[in-house]
Amino acid sequence: MLDPILLRKDLQTVVSRLKTRGVDFDTQRFNELEARRKAVQTETESLQARRNALAKQIGQLKAQGQDASAVLAESQAIPARLKQLEDDLAVVQQSLGDLLMAVPNLPHESVPAGASADDNVEVRRWLPGPPAADGNPPPLPFEPKDHVALGEPLGLDFDTAAKLSGARFSFMRGPVARLHRALAQFMLDLQTGQHGYTECYTPYIVNSSTLYGTGQLPKFKDDMFFVTKGGEDDDPKVDERGNALAREDQYLISTSEITLTSVARDSIIPAANLPLRLTAHTPCFRSEAGSGGRDTRGMIRQHQFDKVEMVQIVHPETSYQVLEDMVGHAEHVLQLLELPYRVVLLCTGDMGFGSAKTYDLEVWLPAQNTWREISSVSNCETFQARRMQARFRAAQGKPDYVHTLNGSGLAVGRALVAVLENHQQADGSIAVPKVLQPYMGGLTVLQP
């Protein structure tokens, strides 16, 4: 959530920066609510002062033996009006909160302005060998197969997945399932062993309050999987008087960024305990409501996929250096897997809702002859922290909001796709990257 004080002090700057994201902020609605808030607070303060003055006057009149009934009558009418103003203020603040909850983060000044992915800026690329003339990885010396053709003989089974669950799911058995597990274990070991993250196991189901805190709700409700408990609709919960209790909404997580970042929710962390570096390997569930039929073949865009997530909760002064560090942590995974990739700085129009600055890592897929996203690393600054009330306190001074950062380290399914395609051999076998061989029982080649 944006800083309300910044909106009050410099609304036009906020509006201009949001326009670079293609967002038109409703200034009329905001100004109306702000005017109402100020009016309510001004009247409240005036009435409180009047109440205090009347109390003093009543005491003086009684001490002098004079009639205080008129003053007392005025004083007795004030509490009811104060209660009404308190209720009015709560309504206004809720409306302001609802308005701001739907507004994305402000882009950092270093983010290039742009409308779409076409305006993103490549920062660097890394190839395990010499590039071709166009700067991309050289073509394979044979016609490359895509990950579906390579994976099916190794146990990648989309027909069974479709029978069990429908489209955009995967079923794996045998060598390809083992490779998928090896990738996840390798990523976790690297992030915990070399990059200083603490491994976590988190719930896969969260309540709506958690999702509001990290920014998935309300904007991305259609991309979430809603969870209904068995029998809940047939046997609604009631209180001791028989009144129906509101059902608590629960959702499957779309990323463990949600659960890892929410560790700091409603808490004040001693500054000496920062940074918090957390990682987890979890399944992620997305409805892909806005995918528009893209990437229907294979594992690129799934309703369920695994990811190793990196989250850091840090002091505001360090967050942009931490962002660069986290990009390096994701790059390290790709380099050890000997996968060609490039780092892209997203423009204002292509960033995620809660991000102030985002880098995407895109891996090369020979069969598609293109780069595809495999990791996204973002600094959300205080955007999530304000929504979650996640703060820190130095030894001296008042609590202040932390900065939160998140990134994929990596998406396991897409890493599997990239390994299959980049390490394929002419006979359809897969050369196992050296770093994965200990996780594969010493196997060096996967034979179809």
Swiss-Prot record:
PROSITE patterns: AA_TRNA_LIGASE_II. It comes from the Bacteria. The keyword ATP-binding applies. Its EC number is 6.1.1.11. GO terms for biological process: selenocysteine biosynthetic process; seryl-tRNA aminoacylation. Homodimer. The tRNA molecule binds across the dimer. This is Serine--tRNA ligase.
